[in-house]
């Protein structure tokens, strides 16, 4: 049975770049990995493949939504380090329900029997959990991961995600494996001071600290993982992913989080330094 990870975080926090590099790091350590992009923008797997691939919704539309006419080869592409990739896609902007498409993609994986064919399956899910469709990966995941940075909005979203994981854990096996700190800047951004306090309060920990570095920006523009890039800072940028891969492929010290109520988190963050 696969190790299933569901990665969430505030919109624009860097989930896709982080997910792709984490998938690559686990693959480089010998794991057979499938990364699934769960966002209508369908750009989650771009750093692994170097292009935007056909989505589940594109393929279904081409066969008039006859599921029996779709094979896994129609929707899966192989990227860097042998990572298999899949994008759920979604309706055009301003129409339809992206969450519904994510829910249908989860069902499709079951139809193809993919849950037993990989060592690791990574769900990269957009933004906050705002509906049942986008929370569907938590029904199958062993662990949730939250990506955040050291600011108010990011931590507020992380708290709501902790609430979603805590609620799902009442009926499913999912637990929180930890928080990934992204864009860590010790000179101007306070490092991870707020995130560390938040993690301790809700009963988890920061499992990785990804630096704020131009190499990461350039890797995204190039459609490459950090492991394929050259230049100053490469080791500094790749090391956190290697360490997180080791942590997740072993037995993570996962917990059921104890989040704040919305009003309480406002008051709490204001008192942290």
UniProtKB/Swiss-Prot annotation:
It comes from the Bacteria. It catalyses: chlorophyllide a + oxidized 2[4Fe-4S]-[ferredoxin] + 2 ADP + 2 phosphate = protochlorophyllide a + reduced 2[4Fe-4S]-[ferredoxin] + 2 ATP + 2 H2O. [4Fe-4S] cluster binds at residues 97, 131. Transmembrane segments: none annotated. Keywords: 4Fe-4S, ATP-binding, Bacteriochlorophyll biosynthesis, Chlorophyll biosynthesis, Iron, Iron-sulfur, Magnesium, Metal-binding, Nucleotide-binding, Oxidoreductase, Photosynthesis. Signal peptide: none annotated. One of its GO terms (molecular function) is oxidoreductase activity, acting on iron-sulfur proteins as donors. Pfam families: Fer4_NifH. It is an enzyme of class 1 (oxidoreductase). InterPro entries: NifH/chlL_CS, NifH/frxC, P-loop_NTPase, Protochlorophyllide_ATP-bd. One of its GO terms (biological process) is photosynthesis, dark reaction. ATP binds at residues 12-17, 41, 182-183. Pathway: Porphyrin-containing compound metabolism; bacteriochlorophyll biosynthesis (light-independent). Its cofactor is [4Fe-4S] cluster. Its EC number is 1.3.7.7. Binds 1 [4Fe-4S] cluster per dimer. Belongs to the NifH/BchL/ChlL family. Homodimer. Protochlorophyllide reductase is composed of three subunits; BchL, BchN and BchB. Component of the dark-operative protochlorophyllide reductase (DPOR) that uses Mg-ATP and reduced ferredoxin to reduce ring D of protochlorophyllide (Pchlide) to form chlorophyllide a (Chlide). This reaction is light-independent. The L component serves as a unique electron donor to the NB-component of the complex, and binds Mg-ATP. This is Light-independent protochlorophyllide reductase iron-sulfur ATP-binding protein. It comes from Chloroflexus aggregans (strain MD-66 / DSM 9485). The lineage of its organism: Bacteria, Bacillati, Chloroflexota, Chloroflexia, Chloroflexales.
